[in-house]
Amino acid sequence: MRRLPGYTTIIPMIEVITEQYAQAGSNCYDLGCSLGASTLAMRHGISFDSCSLVGVDNSEAMIERCEHYIALDDHSLPVSLRCENIQDTELANASVTTLNFTLQFVPPEQRCSLLSRIAEATRPGGVLILSEKIRFDSEDEQAAQTRLHHEFKRANGYSDLEISQKRSAIEQVLIPET
């Protein structure tokens, strides 16, 4: 993905981690599945036919596009997609759960509750794969990181207008923590 540094490393690592932690007869969840990159990585990391893979996103458009990408994939493990708020998703018997740049869109006061629910639903030996943007306490460090991130986007083909529009669109929605 051209807007997130390290994303091209994160997705293959989700597959590797899923290979190590997916358990027979369990559920694997991709919470905030978007277009399905993490979902597909998890799918390829699951070696048990008895696993259920569930992708959840609150955007119908994202779910539709995710369905398209899943249909193009040649892996045989079925994927169940749900269009719902991840805070309302029923979780149980999980061996692998992924929050890939998703938690930052959950209101800060509701994050602990969601993480607790995930922990309670996770089987012994299971794992939560969490990828997030962070913010720095130092204003100077945060400003430097923001400049570097914008330069990364420019280097990957984004115009200044696109960068500005994206920043405006997510300013009050994406709330990273340290």
Regions found by a protein language model. Name each.
Residues 98:
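A conserved beta-strand element that flanks and buttresses the S-adenosyl-L-methionine
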Residues 133-178:
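C-terminal alpha-helical "lid/dimerization" subdomain adjacent to the S-adenosyl-L-methionine
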Residues 125-133:
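Conserved beta-strand signature within the Rossmann-like core of class I S-adenosyl-L-methionine
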